[in-house]
């Protein structure tokens, strides 16, 4: 299983929730992301712009109504300080999630969860198939 790190910053921007402060993941404003079950995702919130913007996960878009998702989620430190991060180890059969700011509405987006059967590795199958005719150009 893989570990993927997103650098989280906060700045003014526009997403499907409107304009205002937004989470930026690796420099992109509130992108929808894919989380593969079994993988670990670290949301590094040590940048000072994260102050007061703790990233969490919810079963509802924008956490409205509130339905916090905590399975496999660990929050470390205080956002905006060195070492601050939110980590999620994606559980088997995890539902579609939404990342959001626990203090302010409209900052996040969707975190689609995908089966751990998906990988970035290539599998080669070796099989001989009979050919009836050869087509030549």
PLM regions with names:
Residues 4-15, 25, 50-52, 71-121, ...:
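Extracellular/periplasmic metallocenter environments
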Residues 36-38, 83, 137:
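Solvent-exposed, conformationally flexible loop/turn segments
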Residues 54-58:
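Beta-strand signatures of extracellular beta-sandwich domains
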């Amino acid at each position: 299983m893989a570990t993927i790190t997103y650098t989280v910053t906060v700045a003014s921007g526009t997403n499907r929730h409107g304009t205002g402060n937004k989470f930026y993941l690796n420099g992109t404003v509130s992108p929808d992301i894919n989380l593969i079950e079994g993988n670990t995702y670290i949301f590094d919130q040590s940048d000072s712009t994260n102050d007061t913007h703790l990233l969490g996960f919810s079963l509802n878009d924008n956490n409205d109504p509130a339905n916090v998702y905590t399975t496999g989620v660990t929050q470390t430190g205080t956002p905006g300080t060195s070492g601050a991060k939110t980590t999620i180890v994606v559980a088997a059969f995890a539902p579609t999630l939404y990342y959001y700011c626990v203090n302010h509405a409209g900052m996040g987006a969707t975190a689609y969860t995908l089966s751990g059967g998906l990988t970035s590795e290539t599998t080669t199958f070796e099989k001989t198939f009979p050919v009836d005719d050869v087509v030549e150009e």
